[in-house]
Amino acid sequence: MLGRKIAGTCLRANVPSVAATSSTPATQTRNSHTIWYPDAKFERQFKTGGTLGKLWMSERVSDFDEKIGLDKLEKLAYSDPVMSDNYSGKQREKNLENMILNFGPQHPAAHGVLRLVLKLEGEVIIKAIPHIGLLHRATEKLIEHKTYTQALPYFDRLDYVSMMCNEQAWSLAVEKLLGIDIPTRAKYIRTLMGELTRIQNHIMGITTHALDVGAMTPFFWMFEEREKLFEFSERVSGARMHANYVRPGGVAWDLPIGLMDDIYDWAIKFPERIDELEDMLTENRIWKARTIDIGLVSAADALNWGFSGVMVRGSGIKQDVRKTEPYDAYADMEFDVPIGTKGDCYDRYLCRIEEMRQSLNIVHQCLNKMPAGEIKVDDHKVVPPKRAEMKENMESLIHHFKFFTEGFQVPPGATYVPIEAPKGEFGVYLVADGTGKPYRCFIRAPGFAHLAAIHDVCYMSLIADIVAVIGTMDIVFGEVDR
């Protein structure tokens, strides 16, 4: 108040002349241009005061106050307080504008065409909205206009990191509707190639996850091994990636001579590569800081969100289609299903590492137990005849022509066949109407359910952690958008 009085005595002499010369009306609109009033920063210094009136309004109105308009300001302050809800000392929070950030689709960590709209409060994510459909190619609709054989290559292009596993799901669904059982050798070949594909996928998943959070070396070291797996795929099918190898009724070709020996030589050396990968990451304090307690998913949430694969096993649930509903040769295989305890990114990383070791175990069993025999069913309505037979037998030529022009008829019915793809439960729901083309094909992609829950997994995480979460989900947009 002392400062107030001094200011008053200094200004008193000038007030009449100002009032006389000014053409401003007596009632002033209170705004930032006419009269000063406390802002949030000023009020924070006097938090105990709580209201504008308590801060700087005098108890009685003096003639000086009336002359410079402070009495009117006082009434305004009490009728419309600036920063207070009441006069109990509670302050009204200042409204903060949250930042809306587009993450992707051209972000290097977006794993393809992922677009996330992030709502940020500082660096904390309070909302994450995935925008899908940028890689939509109407696969399910196209399959309705193709024969059962022509539909197969579309599955290579869904999850384009684990191709032969997708083919397996389609072939098993068609075989189930046809009611056929394929030869044992074909089952073992499918299982062998499926596990090599699983290792190929996990190499990609783990190393790109590490690359996203800043570790480049694992990516370059492990891709040499992935290249060797591509070579095996090329030797067995002629194509490095989109193999079109696992077909309804068996597999397209038998294993070439020498391939099993080469796979064995690779399989006994590969554990050393896994050890090198673990040396770089598992006890690395930076890697642990970026993955432990990040992307936590409880067991109940994992089930409620429809998670599968590593995403559900990392939370401690022992769920694996190869164990619960064995297909092909998995009933004859002995292997363990690794599970996590906490459900964070680090647990899921350890699960993938151990899954690669278990896949190698299955590969060795397939190589040791591989039976001799046929690789396709002996039914030329489902499987085309050999070229040698076509040149000698008229019926074989007719079967060949009918197979590649009209395809084979599947009895009416519907089925759902799940398999344990590297990313989770990949399922095919197939409806047949008795013609040579499917009536409806629905593809259950594991990544779709994982991406749908990204808001809940990332809520209140830092923006840097969303990169780690996307990496641990191992999302590929071919299967999400379809």
Swiss-Prot record:
Pfam families the UniProt entry points to: Complex1_49kDa
Topology in the lipid bilayer: Peripheral membrane protein
UniProt cross-references to Gene3D superfamilies, sorted A to Z: Cytochrome-c3 Hydrogenase, chain B (1.10.645.10)
Record-linked InterPro entries: NADH_Q_OxRdtase_suD (IPR001135), NADH_UbQ_OxRdtase_49kDa_CS (IPR014029), NDH1_su_D/H (IPR022885), NiFe-Hase_large (IPR029014)
Provide the catalytic activity annotation: a ubiquinone + NADH + 5 H(+)(in) = a ubiquinol + NAD(+) + 4 H(+)(out)
A GO molecular function term, named singly, is: NAD binding
Q: Which compartment or compartments is the protein found in?
A: Mitochondrion inner membrane
Organism superkingdom: Eukaryota
Cofactor binding, per record: Binds 1 [4Fe-4S] cluster.
User: What EC number(s) has UniProt assigned to this enzyme?
Assistant: 7.1.1.2
Top EC class for this record: translocase
> Membrane spanning segments where?
none
SUPFAM superfamilies the record matches = HydB/Nqo4-like
Does Membrane appear among the keywords? yes
What processes in GO biological process is this protein linked to?
mitochondrial electron transport, NADH to ubiquinone; response to xenobiotic stimulus
**Coiled-coil intervals:** none
Q: Which GO terms describe its cellular component?
A: intracellular membrane-bounded organelle; mitochondrial inner membrane; respiratory chain complex I
Q: Which UniProt keywords apply?
A: 4Fe-4S, Electron transport, Iron, Iron-sulfur, Membrane, Metal-binding, Mitochondrion, Mitochondrion inner membrane, NAD, Oxidoreductase, Respiratory chain, Transit peptide, Translocase, Transport, Ubiquinone
The residues the record assigns to binding [4Fe-4S] cluster are 345, 351, 366
Give the similarity note.
Belongs to the complex I 49 kDa subunit family.
Protein name per its UniProtKB record: Probable NADH dehydrogenase [ubiquinone] iron-sulfur protein 2, mitochondrial
